């Protein structure tokens, strides 16, 4: 079922501790059980499984429960030991797990959506289960009565969800690339604002309530940090992945952001440095360096008897430039560009060697990651994906051992 991996500790990369195999289809969610050597998984094969580590070092399923429909999302509340499972048919089911994690009792079914559930969050304070789905809505239901309290519709599939428990603000990402901030009430909600910055569908969100930072990952392979608490509209772009960003986790104590992409890439971003905002791209009818006309500027082309050029943009200054004036490439990590991007010649000359020093580390998960979660207190990470494999990682060599007071590495 599961193999214990004996990796030689390396100071620079995550250490693979265990590999769990046995699912018959893609694993859509995997969550580490706090203070236990255990993992809860949900899969397209219609099963919920609780895996516990045995004396042999291997993980074996102590609970194996088959659902009526493929499992598409999951939330686990450890203090009350409640599991909420979203399904492909739109229903959310609640279970209660025994103290020894060997038995799981069905509590109730919530008719939350008309289509596939994409994300679930449980709020104990309000006794709400909040969820998003492919029926283009976010819904919140009362866990005491099982009744629908409210619902808000979007123009496209709602793909991911984060929630601020103190203010009852919900952040919903959708397939159009937009993030909507909602204030949820007992039976109504109000739209506070919408955030637009990605060029692809939003795949994941992470909310840090302490610094009031929202992180979003999308199919445009990029991560954006939205400084909600700063109230100045500040955003930071992070580009280092080569595929869709599927999962995020911000480590507040060490000011690091962990992101995973569908090609197996794992990135750890240093957010404890002074980063610069990427500029807005400027528009012009001619190159802002050599003043040659762009191809749609017919008048200047006629007047100067020259051929029009393609418009490009310098990633550092944002100016509209021609290919000749932006022939060089450079990384510029302080602005989030971890690999080489187009810059104009004058900006290239202004970038020093030390400016190219990476502010992130990149690692290989070696499987298609669709979901990731972390036990920050122990420095553990679990990844799962379309290859039906669940991997448990020791992240302390990468993020450090000081994540929690009294924590010591394995």
Swiss-Prot record:
<dbReference type="InterPro" id="IPR042234">
    <property type="entry name" value="WDFY1/WDFY2"/>
</dbReference>
<keyword id="KW-0853">WD repeat</keyword>
<dbReference type="InterPro" id="IPR036322">
    <property type="entry name" value="WD40_repeat_dom_sf"/>
</dbReference>
<dbReference type="InterPro" id="IPR017455">
    <property type="entry name" value="Znf_FYVE-rel"/>
</dbReference>
<feature type="binding site">
    <location>
        <position position="317"/>
    </location>
    <ligand>
        <name>Zn(2+) 2</name>
    </ligand>
</feature>
<protein>
    <recommendedName>
        <fullName>WD repeat and FYVE domain-containing protein 1</fullName>
    </recommendedName>
</protein>
<dbReference type="GO" id="GO:0005794">
    <property type="term" value="C:Golgi apparatus"/>
</dbReference>
<dbReference type="GO" id="GO:0005730">
    <property type="term" value="C:nucleolus"/>
</dbReference>
<comment type="subunit">
    <text>Binds PtdIns3P in vitro with high specificity over other phosphoinositides. Interacts (via WD repeat 2) with tyrosine-phosphorylated TLR3 (via TIR domain) in response to poly(I:C). Interacts with TLR4 in response to LPS. Interacts with TICAM1 in response to poly(I:C).</text>
</comment>
<feature type="repeat" description="WD 1">
    <location>
        <begin position="22"/>
        <end position="61"/>
    </location>
</feature>
<keyword id="KW-0862">Zinc</keyword>
<keyword id="KW-0967">Endosome</keyword>
<feature type="zinc finger region" description="FYVE-type">
    <location>
        <begin position="281"/>
        <end position="352"/>
    </location>
</feature>
<feature type="binding site">
    <location>
        <position position="325"/>
    </location>
    <ligand>
        <name>Zn(2+) 1</name>
    </ligand>
</feature>
<dbReference type="InterPro" id="IPR015943">
    <property type="entry name" value="WD40/YVTN_repeat-like_dom_sf"/>
</dbReference>
<dbReference type="InterPro" id="IPR000306">
    <property type="entry name" value="Znf_FYVE"/>
</dbReference>
<feature type="repeat" description="WD 6">
    <location>
        <begin position="240"/>
        <end position="279"/>
    </location>
</feature>
<keyword id="KW-0479">Metal-binding</keyword>
<dbReference type="GO" id="GO:0005769">
    <property type="term" value="C:early endosome"/>
</dbReference>
<feature type="binding site">
    <location>
        <position position="287"/>
    </location>
    <ligand>
        <name>Zn(2+) 1</name>
    </ligand>
</feature>
<dbReference type="Pfam" id="PF00400">
    <property type="entry name" value="WD40"/>
</dbReference>
<feature type="binding site">
    <location>
        <position position="290"/>
    </location>
    <ligand>
        <name>Zn(2+) 1</name>
    </ligand>
</feature>
<dbReference type="GO" id="GO:0034141">
    <property type="term" value="P:positive regulation of toll-like receptor 3 signaling pathway"/>
</dbReference>
<keyword id="KW-0597">Phosphoprotein</keyword>
<dbReference type="GO" id="GO:0030054">
    <property type="term" value="C:cell junction"/>
</dbReference>
<feature type="binding site">
    <location>
        <position position="322"/>
    </location>
    <ligand>
        <name>Zn(2+) 1</name>
    </ligand>
</feature>
<dbReference type="InterPro" id="IPR013083">
    <property type="entry name" value="Znf_RING/FYVE/PHD"/>
</dbReference>
<dbReference type="InterPro" id="IPR011011">
    <property type="entry name" value="Znf_FYVE_PHD"/>
</dbReference>
<feature type="binding site">
    <location>
        <position position="314"/>
    </location>
    <ligand>
        <name>Zn(2+) 2</name>
    </ligand>
</feature>
<feature type="repeat" description="WD 5">
    <location>
        <begin position="197"/>
        <end position="236"/>
    </location>
</feature>
<feature type="modified residue" description="Phosphoserine">
    <location>
        <position position="408"/>
    </location>
</feature>
<feature type="binding site">
    <location>
        <position position="347"/>
    </location>
    <ligand>
        <name>Zn(2+) 2</name>
    </ligand>
</feature>
<keyword id="KW-0863">Zinc-finger</keyword>
<comment type="function">
    <text>Positively regulates TLR3- and TLR4-mediated signaling pathways by bridging the interaction between TLR3 or TLR4 and TICAM1. Promotes TLR3/4 ligand-induced activation of transcription factors IRF3 and NF-kappa-B, as well as the production of IFN-beta and inflammatory cytokines.</text>
</comment>
<dbReference type="GO" id="GO:0005545">
    <property type="term" value="F:1-phosphatidylinositol binding"/>
</dbReference>
<dbReference type="GO" id="GO:0034145">
    <property type="term" value="P:positive regulation of toll-like receptor 4 signaling pathway"/>
</dbReference>
<dbReference type="GO" id="GO:0008270">
    <property type="term" value="F:zinc ion binding"/>
</dbReference>
<dbReference type="GO" id="GO:0005829">
    <property type="term" value="C:cytosol"/>
</dbReference>
<dbReference type="InterPro" id="IPR019775">
    <property type="entry name" value="WD40_repeat_CS"/>
</dbReference>
<dbReference type="InterPro" id="IPR020472">
    <property type="entry name" value="G-protein_beta_WD-40_rep"/>
</dbReference>
<feature type="repeat" description="WD 2">
    <location>
        <begin position="66"/>
        <end position="105"/>
    </location>
</feature>
<keyword id="KW-0677">Repeat</keyword>
């Amino acid at each position: 079922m599961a193999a214990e991996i004996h990796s030689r500790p390396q100071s620079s990369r995550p250490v693979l501790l265990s590999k769990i195999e046995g699912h018959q289809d893609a694993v859509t969610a995997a969550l580490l059980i706090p203070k236990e050597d255990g993992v809860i998984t949900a899969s397209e094969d219609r099963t919920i499984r609780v895996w516990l580590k045995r004396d042999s070092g291997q993980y074996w399923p102590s609970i194996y429960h088959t659902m009526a429909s493929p499992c598409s999302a999951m939330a686990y509340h450890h203090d009350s030991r409640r599991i909420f499972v979203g399904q492909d048919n739109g229903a959310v089911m609640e279970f209660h797990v025994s103290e020894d994690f060997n038995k799981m009792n069905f509590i109730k079914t919530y008719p939350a959506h008309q289509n596939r559930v994409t994300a679930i969050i449980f709020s104990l304070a309000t006794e709400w289960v909040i969820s998003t789905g492919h029926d283009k809505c976010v819904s919140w239901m009362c866990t005491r009565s099982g009744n629908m309290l409210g619902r808000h519709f979007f123009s496209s599939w709602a793909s991911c969800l984060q929630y601020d428990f103190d203010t009852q603000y919900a952040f919903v990402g959708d397939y159009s690339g937009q993030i909507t901030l909602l204030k949820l009430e007992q039976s109504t909600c109000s739209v506070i604002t919408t955030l637009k910055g990605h060029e692809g569908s939003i795949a994941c969100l992470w909310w840090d309530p302490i610094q009031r930072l929202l992180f979003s990952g999308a199919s445009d392979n990029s991560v954006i940090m939205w400084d909600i608490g700063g109230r100045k509209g500040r955003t930071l772009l992070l580009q280092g992945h080569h595929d869709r960003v599927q999962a995020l986790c911000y480590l507040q104590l060490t000011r690091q952001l962990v992101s995973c992409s569908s090609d197996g890439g794992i990135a750890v971003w240093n957010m404890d440095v002074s980063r610069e905002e990427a500029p807005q791209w400027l528009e012009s009818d001619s190159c802002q360096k050599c003043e040659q006309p762009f191809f749609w500027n017919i008048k200047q082309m006629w007047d100067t008897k020259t051929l029009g050029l393609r418009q490009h943009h310098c990633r550092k200054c944002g100016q509209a430039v021609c290919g000749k004036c932006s022939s060089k490439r450079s990384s510029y990590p302080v602005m989030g560009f971890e690999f080489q991007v187009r810059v104009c010649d004058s900006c290239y000359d202004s970038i020093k060697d030390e400016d190219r020093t990476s502010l992130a580390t990149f690692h290989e998960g070696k499987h298609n990651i669709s979901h990731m979660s972390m036990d920050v207190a122990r420095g553990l990470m679990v990844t799962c994906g379309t290859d039906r494999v669940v991997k448990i990682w020791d992240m302390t060599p990468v993020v450090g051992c000081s994540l929690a007071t009294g924590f010591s590495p394995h």
